[in-house]
Amino acid sequence: MEQRKHWWNGKWGRIARKDVYLRVSGDQWYVEQRAGGAEGVSHFFEYDSEEAALDTVRALLASPGDWRELSVRPPSR
């Protein structure tokens, strides 16, 4: 699975932090909505197209916060 994009709501701390990830594996697209940082709770969404996944990302990023896109690390070899 390859991570394509990562957004963060600009808040620090386990309670306030939220992240949204866009990933792809083959023809399947995945969106992860995570609350609480690395050890937080995640909800996963699976889609057959990038556009459908991005629709969900846009809806999630409409929630309150100073959302910003974070750079994605290149895949390790």
Mark where each language-model region is.
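Short N-terminal "domain-start" leader segments
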Residues: 1-30, 77
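Short, highly charged C-terminal tails/helix-capping segments
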Residues: 71-77
